Amino acid sequence: MAALAWLGAEHTLALGLTPVGVADAGYYRMRMAAPPLPPASADLGPFWEPSLDRLIALKPDLILMDSWSALDRATFERVAPVLPIPAYPRDASGWSFAAGQLSDLGRRLNRESVAQAALAEAERRIEALRARAQAAGAPPVYVALLAQTGRNATLYGGSGLVGGALERLGLPNAWRGPFSPSGSAVVGLDALAGEPDAVVLAIDLATTSGSFARATTGNALWRLLPSVRKRRVAALGRFYPHGGLASLLAFAEQAATAVEAARG
C-alpha cells in the first residue's frame, strides 16, 4: 500500500507493515517520532502534488489518503482503491479516536491481532507515563510553537492528539481558552504568563531550521515569562499534532520527562 496521509503511514507501520511509498517521506523521517519509516519506503513527493507516475510504478494495492485532502480522489482511484483516513473529530477523546482508528485499520488489513497487541502495549505505556507525571506533581502544561517574530505562539490541546495525551497523563492544559477544531489556538506570547508554574513544552522541529532560536534570542518578553525564569521549559524536537497512537505516546513520553525535570 501507499500512504498520502502521514496518519495512515504511521498506523500502517504500527501494524507491522511497510508502505511502498509515503508523501513527503523525507520530512516524515525528520519529524515523526515513531515508528521509524524504513528506507524501502519511497518518497512520493509533496502532500499537495504527489507524483502519480511514481505511484503507478510502485503498483500499490491500496492508497491511504487524508479524508480532508484537496487531492482529486478519482485520479488516485484509477491507480488503486483509496481508503480515506479521517482527522481527529472536534468532540472526541484523542486517545479513544486514535486507538479506534488503529483497531479499525487492523481489521481492514487483516492485522487485527497485531492491532490488539499494539493497543494493549500502548495502554501499558500510557499508564506508566501517567504514574510518572503524577509523581512529578502533575503541573499545568503549555504546548507551544512560537512564531518566528517571537510575538505570538500556536498552542495545542483540545480534543486532538495533545488533548488526548494530557488527559491520559492527568496533566492540565495551562491554556484554558478555546481551541480550533484541529486542536490549536493562536495567542500573544504574553498568554504563556497565565499559569506561572506551568511547564512550557516548546516545539523546536528539525524541519523548521532553528526558528525557535530565532524567536527567543534577544526576546525580552520570552525571558520575562515565569516559566522561562523558573527554567520550566523543555524542547519538543519531534512533534506532529495530527498523528496516531504512536505519535501520541511519543509526545506523552516527552511530556512526562519534561514535568519530571521541572520538579528537579
Residues of each region from the PLM?
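Short helix-initiation/N-cap motifs at beta->coil->alpha
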Residues: 44-52, 179-189
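Alpha-helical, coiled-coil/dimerization segments enriched in small aliphatic residues
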Residues: 26-31, 155-184
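Proline-aspartate-enriched helix->loop->beta-strand connector
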Residues: 52, 56-65, 192, 196-201
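Charged, glycine-enriched surface loops/patches
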Residues: 14, 73-112, 210-236
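Extracytoplasmic substrate-binding proteins
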Residues: 81-149, 241, 245-264
